[in-house]
Amino acid sequence: MPLAFCGSENHSAAYRVDQGVLNNGCFVDALNVVPHVFLLFITFPILFIGWGSQSSKVHIHHSTWLHFPGHNLRWILTFMLLFVLVCEIAEGILSDGVTESHHLHLYMPAGMAFMAAVTSVVYYHNIETSNFPKLLIALLVYWTLAFITKTIKFVKFLDHAIGFSQLRFCLTGLLVILYGMLLLVEVNVIRVRRYIFFKTPREVKPPEDLQDLGVRFLQPFVNLLSKGTYWWMNAFIKTAHKKPIDLRAIGKLPIAMRALTNYQRLCEAFDAQVRKDIQGTQGARAIWQALSHAFGRRLVLSSTFRILADLLGFAGPLCIFGIVDHLGKENDVFQPKTQFLGVYFVSSQEFLANAYVLAVLLFLALLLQRTFLQASYYVAIETGINLRGAIQTKIYNKIMHLSTSNLSMGEMTAGQICNLVAIDTNQLMWFFFLCPNLWAMPVQIIVGVILLYYILGVSALIGAAVIILLAPVQYFVATKLSQAQRSTLEYSNERLKQTNEMLRGIKLLKLYAWENIFRTRVETTRRKEMTSLRAFAIYTSISIFMNTAIPIAAVLITFVGHVSFFKEADFSPSVAFASLSLFHILVTPLFLLSSVVRSTVKALVSVQKLSEFLSSAEIREEQCAPHEPTPQGPASKYQAVPLRVVNRKRPAREDCRGLTGPLQSLVPSADGDADNCCVQIMGGYFTWTPDGIPTLSNITIRIPRGQLTMIVGQVGCGKSSLLLAALGEMQKVSGAVFWSSLPDSEIGEDPSPERETATDLDIRKRGPVAYASQKPWLLNATVEENIIFESPFNKQRYKMVIEACSLQPDIDILPHGDQTQIGERGINLSGGQRQRISVARALYQHANVVFLDDPFSALDIHLSDHLMQAGILELLRDDKRTVVLVTHKLQYLPHADWIIAMKDGTIQREGTLKDFQRSECQLFEHWKTLMNRQDQELEKETVTERKATEPPQGLSRAMSSRDGLLQDEEEEEEEAAESEEDDNLSSMLHQRAEIPWRACAKYLSSAGILLLSLLVFSQLLKHMVLVAIDYWLAKWTDSALTLTPAARNCSLSQECTLDQTVYAMVFTVLCSLGIVLCLVTSVTVEWTGLKVAKRLHRSLLNRIILAPMRFFETTPLGSILNRFSSDCNTIDQHIPSTLECLSRSTLLCVSALAVISYVTPVFLVALLPLAIVCYFIQKYFRVASRDLQQLDDTTQLPLLSHFAETVEGLTTIRAFRYEARFQQKLLEYTDSNNIASLFLTAANRWLEVRMEYIGACVVLIAAVTSISNSLHRELSAGLVGLGLTYALMVSNYLNWMVRNLADMELQLGAVKRIHGLLKTEAESYEGLLAPSLIPKNWPDQGKIQIQNLSVRYDSSLKPVLKHVNALIAPGQKIGICGRTGSGKSSFSLAFFRMVDTFEGHIIIDGIDIAKLPLHTLRSRLSIILQDPVLFSGTIRFNLDPERKCSDSTLWEALEIAQLKLVVKALPGGLDAIITEGGENFSQGQRQLFCLARAFVRKTSIFIMDEATASIDMATENILQKVVMTAFADRTVVTIAHRVHTILSADLVIVLKRGAILEFDKPEKLLSRKDSVFASFVRADK
């Protein structure tokens, strides 16, 4: 019909223009269409045909790269415009429906405006991405025309007295405002960019981040719609489904999010705080203020989003109330009174009374609410991640200045610092994530209670009181849960510590048959842990129970009380289901309360820890301004190292200042000797603890420049401490340390106002020192990276260093040569290899000063000689570099230019060897008896002989005799085998399997059939009862609705009351049953988790402890330990809660969809496409989430490892002056971890936004179909309310179902990995001989017969001993020697059946050891290994863990091992504590404890495998004599580290390539000129 636009009536109102065309409402509406048609006609050709030449576009790899001025405001105004236009369309449709005539002009212009608004934002987006602002002129014209036409319409409304009572008037006024603001935004773009009306446009460059192709995190740069919906993640998620995500895929962080940027922001906040605080305190309060100043704005933004989301969340209950109320009442057709040219306009009240309108408003409110909620989450987590990176960087920079005494003897450990980084920074991050709840929860509770009161009246206060009164109970449970978790963590840490010790010392445990002792030790701690876990499970189940039961209880009490005490009150479906939805909302903040309170408390504790750490003692070194001239003078060649430790807690000690004269007297003299001096200490007293007794006393020494200085002395006399004192690592009580000054280009003046000077002369900062510590410190990096150590790579120098340290054979055998990752702390290498790589690092550096702390301790004589000759002498001393060498190898003293002899922390004497010969005759003679000085020609001859006898390199260990390989043959075989398995720790294998259903089945089957049946049955029954409760509520409220009008004619009011009572009673029974089932299911889930955790850990421990030694050699220790740590923790604590959440969210979604389908079966038609979309979303998300979660974990490990490595190697890093380089690596590691965390957060938001949008669609479809059915099929209002309530439930739980599914998939990997280890075959502990047939005192003589013995480490490997025959008489002392790789250690291990004996026999005292049970065999022999192994615990436990020996026996063993005096001096004596790894004793003392441990056993056969490698020669000689006398009647087999130690043996066995080369008395072998043993002795002289 031609007149349908203005109305289909036959009268002429549409033509009436007698009062002017602008007074014709239809004409005005038609005029409003013109701007929209104009925009569509202008923009569509530009968008689809093509606009601008390609040359006018800026090509960049990101789509959205530039935001015009007012970008976010434009998007916000456009969204508001679209919403108002939707309301205008709906209002027009409703107004048009009042009369029979159709007036298209009531809603068609609004529809065109809606299309134009969408087109405008699409058009703007494309112009913005191409940076071509001139085309915005079309939008300028459009906004102008739209504003003018809409203003005309608004004015005409005013002229016809249409006001606020009509919704159309309000909407038109809003549109005028919005169009006007959009016009102003467009004018502002012209003002800023000057693309029109100005001669010179203003060019804007792309953001710096997006010019970097490596930046792929686009959240800060995309438009507002993409930010809110994470649309930019679509391509990333899609790509992740095709190929694994790695660090290259996620790229780099934007500059504003990098750790350095946030660290600078935090430092500025700290500085501002210090400026405000005159005292400059660094307490917890100052830290909180700095954090709020640096990151508070983003937190306010997150809180604003959260409050808006929570307020919008109340739209659900209100809309349910309106819809159900509309359907539950007989609504008369309303007739609006106001007309405009024959058209009726609805009022706002009439508009909101329409059920369909409410359904659409509910849909839009849900979309907006979910968007705001996810935006709040994202901003809070992003802020937390940025804060974490800033704090980690600040902690690291503090570590670089930390006093060494704090770590070695003082207040903190490396573990505490790592906990600060790994745990406390995360606590602060999660506090910032939960922080918006602190402001949002009170708002949500207050608004929720007000609305409940508005709907229910006084009854609402009953339910609210129930919830609020139970909140303290929840808090109490949460507190107990937190305590149980802390207790569990403590026991877990103790168990992991014991497991770690057990795994690191597994070789010793097996050799000593102590497996059961340490298994029992771990199981005892595990039982304590399980007790805590049981408490944790109980409180967790109570917490879960309360979360599900409190809403049921509140609803039960409220509704029953409502109908019982307020009989005239309204209990319609609208009231009931709106109240039910409000109760669910009201309970949420109270559930969060416990989490928020716990997180707040943890954050307060973490900040307190951080405050204590940041205020801990530092080593202050003056920073010198670069390129300042050096003052000339006689003392300018020296610089005093500022050793004073700044301790803010304690005043400086002055009581020891009198030990030396005034500081002026300590200035070095300006004579000729001083000119040649590199380091000089005068009157130095040094200590490790501020209040402790000086470790070094009255130290006055000089170290000559460009010469070799050796420091010698007995074990524990302070040699290593002297080096550290010179490096400034010890606390100086008094005295001064002077370093010769550096060239002007390398040093600078010190601008510090706190300069600590020894004199009035200028004090210089010392240069880098190449330092190799006694305990090798290696990075978790390649061999090459450990040697060059961030220095430029020089191939020639690198090869020279490799050759000098005899590393080439070791490199050849590694899987990837010198590019092999050697693992954290060098766990892939032997002690000797670690030592030589550490020394190689010092040799490679170009530093003028080199400190080497006992570099020969783990090396045999050949390697030591070669290192001394080719490395220290040729590479260092001949290059005129200053070398300070701490050593026990006195045979090298003739090479020293200067010797410093120490005794008991003091300097006994310093000078040349001739000086000692003249003035210290007794000491010199003592040395002479120990060293038997060798001449230069013989040393060269020995080295030449070694090279001549070396076989070709690159072969496997069993085939070659390479120098410097693993000190134990089994470790060498490990390297050979793993080379075939590609054991390069640098390559991370991606396993992208589907959901591990088998692991899930194994997990559930471990619980047992009864518990599993109870779990499944209780879960299903619980959700059936929950549905029954709500269904019965619908029937009850429907009956109340129909009863109300009938009650007027009811003769017997008792019947009505009886009917209500029946409904209330059934409702009470169902609710009570539901509460009971909630308790049963929560307890069952946690009990299942406990049972599975207990069973899997016990099986894992039993399997691992009984595994053969080959398993530990071919499986990385970290991998095994991870099964006991992270995987067991996942099974203990995470899988049960995830399983409960997954089952609950899945069953809730299924039951909700079932209820909706029951209420409106037509919903099933719409459900199918939504289900397909949901399936693909979860499918893509799970793959990306799994990869990102693994990437987040794997990027965190290097970060934590870097912290641990830095703390352990702090002395080395500071000695090298590499602080800045390590800080840069820290920033890289932090950024890598943060970018993975941010992508994971964005992926989670991507999922949740989509799933919640799908949930909103479910709500819309359910609402529309329910309303339609109710209007046409007489569907009861109660069922409509039921369907809508469950539709809201779907929108809440759908994303949790997918998230929990992804989490469960990831966590079941722990079960899969543990079950993989459970397949490991155990050693065959059973023997052919029954225990009763073995004499109790066997072996009582010590006679050993070796018959044609051939052994190998695995059936797939070649033999390491071939056809060995020997006869050892009882009580004989046998020495075994041979070059590295000759089979010495394999020979000793064969006695314990630690290797595969595939041919021959070993018969001890008439019994073939192959027939003995393993435990019996190993418990009857004794061995001492080269690497000392001590366990945390008492000295008594370390010597006698079986508790079989008396104290006198233990003291006797300590006396034999030269440790009796040391132990007696300790508090507690035998009960004194040995720390983990024996770190509170020196390396030599640890070895002596191992000797004492072997002496305690008093077996007839005693094997020493290079047991004295870490002991000085004097102590070694004493021990050898003691062994010979104390074990005169026992058979002793000694594998020689120094050949001279076996000269007194009865027989000597010389091995070569696994075969006996020589076997005779030592004097006979020495008498033969061609004897290999004789050549060894000559080389050892």
Swiss-Prot record:
Changing residue 207 to S: In PNDM3; likely pathogenic; reduced inhibition by ATP. It comes from the Eukaryota. InterPro entries: AAA+_ATPase, ABC1_TM_dom, ABC1_TM_sf, ABC_transporter-like_ATP-bd, ABC_transporter-like_CS, ABC_transporter_C-like, ABCC8, ABCC8/9. GO terms for molecular function: ABC-type transporter activity; ADP binding; ATP binding; ATP hydrolysis activity; ATP-activated inward rectifier potassium channel activity; ATPase-coupled monoatomic cation transmembrane transporter activity; ATPase-coupled transmembrane transporter activity; metal ion binding. Disulfide bonds join 6-26. Changing residue 187 to D: In HHF1; severe; high prevalence in Finland; loss of channel activity. Changing residue 70 to E: In HHF1; altered intracellular trafficking. Residues 966-984 have a biased composition (Acidic residues). Residues 935-949 have a biased composition (Basic and acidic residues). Belongs to the ABC transporter superfamily. ABCC family. Conjugate transporter (TC 3.A.1.208) subfamily. Forms an heterooctamer with KCNJ11; four ABCC8/SUR1 molecules interact with one KCNJ11 homotetramer. This is ATP-binding cassette sub-family C member 8. It comes from Homo sapiens. The gene is ABCC8.
